[in-house]
Amino acid sequence: MNRRFFILATIGAGTALALLPQNSKTHIDIAPFKVIEAVQQTLFPKNLKAPCASQFGATNYLLLVSSHSSFVKSDLKFLKYGADLLINYKNDFLTMNSKDRDEALRDFVDSSSKAENWVALLLFYTLEALLSDPIYGGNRNELGWRWLNHNTGQPQPKLKFAQIE
């Protein structure tokens, strides 16, 4: 791992952790989210016409929503499991350049149905981060909406999560 990548990963993880609700911070294992962040950056890299994952806050979104009680716990468990599966498949994935990461991710998806399902689930949540209301922690600066030229419906949410009684 080079120094620049380490610093960027640490800043990204620290920022994401700081955005979590105070009572959920003790229950978050940040290691899988470093892998998830790298995969999201591979799926939505810089230099495309679409916003890149770091620009629209894909990992921050997933950290925020997965810490809420309404998040499907089996999804969180599978997301963490898949991150471990990927690192076991390619232990140098986090230190690869973007081209090698893309190739490794394609090989990983082809290696098993679990790997394919994991990437599909992660893509689902990444697209949700791109297109959801910014109040939920993704779609930073409405980048996803602006990219698609989308006009939002009204009224927009005022609270992050509905109050369940």
Protein language model annotation of sequence segments:
Residues 1-12:
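N-terminal secretory signal peptides and thylakoid transit peptides that target proteins
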Residues 3, 28-37:
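Onset of an N-terminal alpha helix
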Residues 17-29:
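Bacterial Sec-dependent signal peptides at the C-terminal "C-region" and cleavage site
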Residues 34, 38-41, 50, 57-165:
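Mature-region segments of soluble proteins
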